[in-house]
Amino acid sequence: MKKTKFFLLGLAALAMTACNKDNEAEPVTEGNATISVVLKTSNSNRAFGVGDDESKVAKLTVMVYNGEQQEAIKSAENATKVEDIKCSAGQRTLVVMANTGAMELVGKTLAEVKALTTELTAENQEAAGLIMTAEPKTIVLKAGKNYIGYSGTGEGNHIENDPLKIKRVHARMAFTEIKVQMSAAYDNIYTFVPEKIYGLIAKKQSNLFGATLVNADANYLTGSLTTFNGAYTPANYANVPWLSRNYVAPAADAPQGFYVLENDYSANGGTIHPTILCVYGKLQKNGADLAGADLAAAQAANWVDAEGKTYYPVLVNFNSNNYTYDSNYTPKNKIERNHKYDIKLTITGPGTNNPENPITESAHLNVQCTVAEWVLVGQNATW
């Protein structure tokens, strides 16, 4: 009889352990407080896909942490607010994320959430599901109802009246104008026929939280099938077709480019891997494709490859005498989250056969950039 009693007690203990484990996986708090959060996103701009997709919040998730442990988590679809999240009074950490897709967040510790990463994808290039985050925020919850982003005139504890700001993890780089104005030395001799726009040396992975989102992952992506082995070319480099676009003449309301992740190439010494936006096509002489001695001479000058094709690369947000920036902006030699880099390119002569080598100060290009947040950076480039 005693053995049977101990056996049943053991089964009950195991059952309780299983229940506790389930509760840790899906935090449910029968606390004495609730919090409701209203979100503010950056304004949308003209996207490569549907314009509003840049700012669309398909899924908003709010997590409340008591120390390292997740006390509550709640999500809302196609919404910019999450209401009545059940938790307990006291000092807590609030974490807000949007467009996390299939990412599993339930039960994660605060440290695990802060360590999350994302990768650049084909879906990003149509502005769909651009992930957004706000830095973890320390708050003090009072018993009863708590609010962030609501008018302070109603009931409850209004922690902040302003909506919580959330920012895209991605940046956008795009040509908004490309024009050919050959200088006197090349005018009426050479012409350029654009065929493709490429994104080169794009970081594959990014952190989701932190003062900088650049991490130590050494993988990069390119839209070109050509192996350049230039001074900027990274060792871990993979081709993806979605960093390549057939050429369409860009305009302010029809930008041509790509969404990318943070990349820092501001080091004063050593090897750097700057993110590049590049237009590619044929260099022609007297209206005809280069051939024979003309092709050989252009190759010897490092203007074209064996097929007579040339590249006009623009190092995004880079400090160069060939580049000018709008509004007295100082280039930072890095890609920053939630920025859009709008580039006007003027071509004044032949390009290069290796877009992943440093450009010379006498390159045949002018670049004008505009930077904004969805910080616009306006960059003007002249080749």
From Swiss-Prot:
Effect of M1A: Abolishes FimA biosynthesis
Modification note: Synthesized as palmitoylated precursor. Efficient export to the outer membrane and integration into fimbriae requires lipidation and subsequent proteolytic removal of the lipidated propeptide.
Intracellular or extracellular location(s): Fimbrium; Cell outer membrane
Lipoprotein keyword on record: yes
One of the record's GO cellular component terms: cell outer membrane
Main location group: other
Signal peptide span: 1-18
One Pfam family recorded for the sequence: FimA4_C
Disrupted gene: phenotype observed: FimA-deficient cells lack major fimbriae, resulting in strongly decreased adherence to host cells. Double mutants lacking both FimA and Mfa1 lack major and minor fimbriae; they fail to adhere to host cells.
Record site: Cleavage: R46, A47
Family statement drawn from the similarity comment of this UniProt entry: Belongs to the bacteroidetes fimbrillin superfamily. FimA/Mfa1 family.
Summary of subunit composition and partner proteins: Fimbriae are composed of a major, structural subunit (FimA) and the minor components FimC, FimD and FimE. Head-to-tail oligomerization of FimA molecules mediates assembly of the fimbrium stalk, while the minor components probably form the fimbrium tip. Linear, head-to-tail oligomerization of FimA is mediated by a conformation change, facilitating the insertion of a C-terminal beta-strand into a groove in the N-terminal domain of the following subunit. The anchoring subunit FimB limits fimbrium length and is important for solid fimbrium attachment to the outer membrane.
Protein name: Major fimbrium subunit FimA type-1
